[in-house]
Curated annotation (Swiss-Prot):
It catalyses: (1R,6R)-6-hydroxy-2-succinyl-cyclohexa-2,4-diene-1-carboxylate = 2-succinylbenzoate + H2O. It comes from Yersinia pseudotuberculosis serotype I (strain IP32953). It holds the Pfam family MR_MLE_C. NCBIfam families: menC_gam_Gplu, PRK05105.1. SUPFAM superfamilies: Enolase C-terminal domain-like, Enolase N-terminal domain-like. Belongs to the mandelate racemase/muconate lactonizing enzyme family. MenC type 1 subfamily. The lineage of its organism: Bacteria, Pseudomonadati, Pseudomonadota, Gammaproteobacteria, Enterobacterales. This is o-succinylbenzoate synthase.
Amino acid sequence: MRTATLYRYSVPMEAGVILRHQRLKSRDGLLVKLQQGELSGWGEIAPLPEFSQETLDQAQVAAECWLQHWVSGVESDDSVLPSVAFGLSCAQAELKQTLPLSADYRKASLCTGDPDELFAVLQALPGEKVAKVKVGLYEAVRDGMIVNVLLEALPDLTLRLDANRSWSRAKADGFAKYVNPALRSRIAFLEEPCKTRAESREFAQDTGIAIAWDESVREADFQVEAEPGVAAIVIKPTLVGSLARCQQLVQQAHQAGLVAVISSSIESSLGLTQLARLAAWLTPATVPGLDTLDLMQAQVVRPWPDSPLPLITTEQLGVVWHR
């Protein structure tokens, strides 16, 4: 016999979490639990405002429709809504025990704040020093100067930078001007520096700063291929779709000689632990981009190892659908 439950969560965010144009005050999403006999599987459905194509309400409607079929014994195709496809595929994989349990809890530290604070945090990082810095929120020249200072001060540091298509080509060049050419190879990649792919490609070739595709990966005309100056693709499953789609993208990236990075869309601790398992399975040689839990004030159902944040249990969540 099959049963399914859909829970809704809302976790307050730390102050100062800004998406593209708005402050994110709470992270809201759905957790799905599939039960078949003694086996169960969980997944998270959490569209990210300003980044996902679907809203949470739309995702809930689609999830309920899929679950209604599933409990009736009908196997439906993946949802066309990426967050729904990802969450339901995780729940099915756990149910079928096809999502490996081993997890990669390493994370590229997400760095915000002034350079002095960043330096202290980065200096204290154990092991491989890989950090992610958001650029494009302030002046490009300022970003370039900060990146240069960090790379100069910490010779074993590798940076991943994310501009979210913030810059014109001129501003991107302004950034590069302040990064010493001798240090640029320690920028693992800069995600989507310019507003168009063509400008980003030109920027990479002209400056020697490697780029990665992020937003582009979710666009209909995108193809994974080796290109001069392109080092990686960033895969955010909540925005991309099912586990099968993620696996396909990773395989295509590796075949093209590109790095594939499994990355967070600010999921709850439950979703993050599943992303850590996905990373250990599909991209074991690459540190995943999962350092977003500390943006929240609580964990949900499953804890991240060693996190001091309080845990919201299943009993504390609201049930929005059950059959």
